[in-house]
Amino acid sequence: MKKTTSQNGFTLIELIIVMVILGIMAAVAVPRYLDSIENAEESTENAVISSIRSGLKQAANDSLYTHGRASWPTNPFEVFVAGQEPAGYTTDNSLANDDGEWTFFAVGNVTKISHQRNDNRRFTWTYTKAVSYTHLTLPTILLV
């Protein structure tokens, strides 16, 4: 009887080709993944700042209705219901220094909102509390 042997498996060339294809796919996918993370963090920042702006308008309207005069909080994060602040918000009155951290702090007469992204980049916004409710003196939040 003739003995037959079957060899199952991949040749070295086939394995190398698969590795090259996987390398090309990874080279394309990783930068896109990192860009999507950055875009998500930027969108989160925009959403938080928009929420603060909306809350400041509502706080002014509530104050106007209750006291007859519009006023705004010194800390813009006070517009959030307790426990509803953005994830990572701390009240340590310093520049954000942890990933995902949001802070509000004052340096002299300048008040700022800061956020540190997961890649350790920090972004700050200057918050200027308004004095009266006219089109010229609304509170401003500007990216620095």
PLM feature segments, named:
Residues I16-R32:
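Alpha-helical hydrophobic helix detector
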Residues M1-F10:
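N-terminal leader/signal peptides at the extreme start of proteins
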Residues E38-T66:
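Membrane-proximal N-terminal amphipathic helix
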